From Swiss-Prot:
PROSITE patterns from the UniProt entry: UDPGT (PS00375)
GO molecular function: UDP-glucosyltransferase activity
Protein name, UniProt field: UDP-glycosyltransferase 88F5
PANTHER family xref list: GLYCOSYLTRANSFERASE
Entry-linked InterPro entries: UDP-glycosyltransf_plant, UDP_glucos_trans, UDP_glycos_trans_CS
Length: 481
């Protein structure tokens, strides 16, 4: 079987897709004669498995040197009233025996050159070491968020209170221009009494103990101060920082994305975009889990209507529990019922609203698209950067508030919306109108667009023969061969 690189994805289709993209990059660069890729993934109650089998069949067919190993089903044992993050982290730990068995079996017929894990799969780090396999992390957000995570054990020492109670208190991270509010920390660390808090501290403390960290970004995109803070050891003041390899941007090809959305509606929105003037359309899409209460949808609609701008807006079904934005949108809802009366009719000449899903990568590359309202999920950020489209930053969950800070203040490729933290991040219609006009009409918006266009060219160059990301991938492979 030769040399193999084993990747271990955290639960869920999004994490598997990220690992597949890394595997594809390695195979594309070095060919299947050099490395084959095996991706380990979990099966159980916390995993959304509906879209996974079809996706894996597609990848296995188109990339035969990438194979998949699904673990036996694990039933989560936790019944206590704890957070979803804590339940997921416990679920991953329960898969440790399967990780050990998989590495044991693979090692019998192949030389495992590297074991690459997701941050949430940190409990597998000592297993890789146990087999004397060089073990790396694949970090799927940007360098600024990585700097924060590396530094987080030091932040933990600065207070004994929960960040959710500190709210407006700000914390400084090495290399960042602006501090982060306590309430904008990643959700699993907001409550010090949640088991997920100690899990996250453990994950962050183990990052430096790996053989290296592979990051889905490219050097030219990142603030030099952040890159210097990581390389100079400021983020891990108590010990050595492992090598960091910036190998992105890794973006999934649209043809391999899920085609669950209505094909006719998808074609309609692309045809509509082709008829609009250059850089005139604002695209609004908040990721696979970005669902808003009806009251917020009405404010967005009012802001868009008042702005007078052309728009393509992806609307997901409002969540049943309004406090939760992490609910998958589906098509079984009345679009007119969640928007202001007459909105669709009044804006029909300059706007289009689609339910649940649009082919984001294709949309962002359309000549008519001039701006993107995003939840700041890192994949979406990279897709916008590659397409050269400036952003309005509207973070919802995960590390997105961290990304917002850096996109607006350090990278200067986005305008931030003002969110009312005391109202769950609510944004008024007036604020929507203000930021939309700022991006689409002002000199500042034009400057952002120019900057994004240049970064798009740099993204392409980074993956070229002499680019920074190619050099970093060569350095990674040199470290394992």
């Amino acid at each position: 079987m030769g040399d193999v690189i084993v990747l271990y994805a955290a639960p869920g289709i999004g994490h598997i897709v990220s690992m597949v993209e890394l595997g594809k990059l390695i195979v594309h660069r070095y060919g299947p004669h050099k490395f084959s890729i095996t991706i380990l993934y979990t099966c159980g109650s916390v995993v959304d498995i509906t879209s996974i089998p079809a996706y894996i069949r597609r990848i296995s067919h188109s990339h035969p040197s990438i194979s998949f190993l699904q673990f036996p089903r694990v039933t989560n044992k936790i019944t206590r009233n704890i957070s979803g993050a804590a339940i997921m982290f416990d679920f991953i730990r329960q898969n440790d025996p399967h990780v050990r068995r998989a590495l044991q079996e693979i090692s019998k017929s192949a030389a495992v050159r590297a074991f690459i894990i997701d941050l949430f799969c940190t409990s597998a780090l000592p297993i890789g070491k146990e087999f004397n396999i060089p073990t790396y992390y694949f970090y799927t957000s940007g360098a600024a968020a990585l700097a924060a995570f590396l530094y987080f054990p030091k932040i933990d020492e600065q207070t004994t209170e929960s960040f959710k109670d500190l709210r407006e208190t700000v914390f400084e991270f090495p290399g960042w221009k602006s501090p982060l509010k306590a309430i904008h920390m990643v959700e699993p660390v907001l409550d010090r009494n949640d088991p997920a808090y100690s899990d996250m501290i453990y994950f962050c403390s183990q990052l430096p103990k790996s053989n290296g960290i592979i990051v889905n970004t490219f050097e030219e995109l990142e603030p030099p101060s952040v890159l210097q803070a990581i390389a100079g050891g400021l983020c891990v003041p108590d010990g050595p920082t492992p090598p960091v390899y910036y190998v992105g941007p890794l973006i999934e090809e649209e043809k391999e994305l899920s085609k669950d959305a209505d094909a006719a509606e998808k074609e309609d929105c692309l045809s509509w975009l082709d008829k609009q003037p250059s850089r005139s359309v604002l695209f609004l899409c908040f990721g696979s889990m970005g669902s808003f209460p009806a009251a917020q949808l009405k404010e967005i609609a009012n802001g868009l209507e008042a702005s007078g701008q052309r728009f393509l807006w992806v609307v997901k079904k409002p969540p049943v529990e309004e406090k939760s934005k992490q609910v998958h949108g589906v098509d079984d809802f009345d679009l007119k019922g969640v928007l202001p009366e007459g909105f669709l009719e009044r804006t029909a000449d300059r706007g289009m609203v689609v339910k649940s899903w649009a082919p984001q990568v294709v949309v962002l590359k359309k000549e008519s698209v001039g701006g993107f309202v995003t939840h700041c999920g890192w994949n979406s950020v990279l897709e916008a950067v590659v397409a050269g489209v400036p952003m309005i930053a509207w973070p919802l969950y995960a590390e997105q508030h961290m990304n917002r800070n850096v996109l607006v203040t350090d990278m200067e490729i986005a305008i931030g919306v003002e969110q009312r933290d005391e109202e769950g991040g609510f944004v008024s219609g007036e604020e929507v109108e203000r930021r939309v006009r700022e991006l689409m009409e002002s000199e500042g918006g034009r400057a952002l667009r120019e900057r994004c266009k240049k970064l798009g060219e740099m993204a392409s160059a980074a993956l070229g023969e002499t680019g920074s990301s190619t050099r970093n991938m060569v350095n990674f492979v040199s470290s394992i061969t």
